[in-house]
Amino acid sequence: MDTLAPESTRQNLRSQRLNLLTNEPHQRLESLVKSKEPFASRDNFARFVAAQYLFQHDLEPLYRNEALARLFPGLASRARDDAARADLADLGHPVPEGDQSVREADLSLAEALGWLFVSEGSKLGAAFLFKKAAALELDENFGARHLAEPEGGRAQGWKSFVAILDGIELNEEEERLAAKGASDAFNRFGDLLERTFA
């Protein structure tokens, strides 16, 4: 993996290290999403949104965590659980009941950073998904709110997030936990996707 990024990037940017360390679960999840054909029909898309809702439901306590909010100003406004819930209502799909395994987990700050890294990073890929949703006549006002471009733009939102993420001081063990949190987040979404498409 060391050949995939310049040495200075690997050493200095946590966001780049996390990208490298989570490449396998990320690629596995992308393949799983494609296999479910979420844009084949509105019903399939609703199942995809249900997984998105459950994932955002998992993350809701992190987006409203006071310690994290001190690090990331306006963090609560980045949450998408309400948008996904509204999309499910638009699509006539019941709101699934999430389990409490992640919400009640005793995540360290470093692990939480990994989970947020995955959630915030997914907003970049959501641009492609949002365009695909248009073929189902869904948009930021109906059915695809959670994929819509955030206020201020996707690129700027991500840039501001990683600028803070990359600047937080973590020791070696905390770096490991951040990577674990990110991998766990990718795997969790895969599990939720399997559940909603079962």
UniProtKB/Swiss-Prot annotation:
<comment type="function">
    <text>Involved in heme degradation. Catalyzes the degradation of heme to biliverdin, with the release of iron. Forms biliverdin delta (70%) and beta (30%). Under anaerobic conditions ferredoxin--NADP(+) reductase (fpr) can provide the necessary electrons; Bfd is not required.</text>
</comment>
<dbReference type="InterPro" id="IPR016053">
    <property type="entry name" value="Haem_Oase-like"/>
</dbReference>
<dbReference type="GO" id="GO:0046872">
    <property type="term" value="F:metal ion binding"/>
</dbReference>
<dbReference type="InterPro" id="IPR016084">
    <property type="entry name" value="Haem_Oase-like_multi-hlx"/>
</dbReference>
<keyword id="KW-0479">Metal-binding</keyword>
<feature type="binding site" description="axial binding residue">
    <location>
        <position position="26"/>
    </location>
    <ligand>
        <name>heme b</name>
    </ligand>
</feature>
<keyword id="KW-0408">Iron</keyword>
<dbReference type="GO" id="GO:0006788">
    <property type="term" value="P:heme oxidation"/>
</dbReference>
<keyword id="KW-0349">Heme</keyword>
<dbReference type="GO" id="GO:0004392">
    <property type="term" value="F:heme oxygenase (decyclizing) activity"/>
</dbReference>
<dbReference type="Pfam" id="PF01126">
    <property type="entry name" value="Heme_oxygenase"/>
</dbReference>
<comment type="similarity">
    <text>Belongs to the heme oxygenase family.</text>
</comment>
<keyword id="KW-0560">Oxidoreductase</keyword>
<dbReference type="GO" id="GO:0071281">
    <property type="term" value="P:cellular response to iron ion"/>
</dbReference>
<protein>
    <recommendedName>
        <fullName>Heme oxygenase PigA</fullName>
        <ecNumber>1.14.99.58</ecNumber>
    </recommendedName>
</protein>
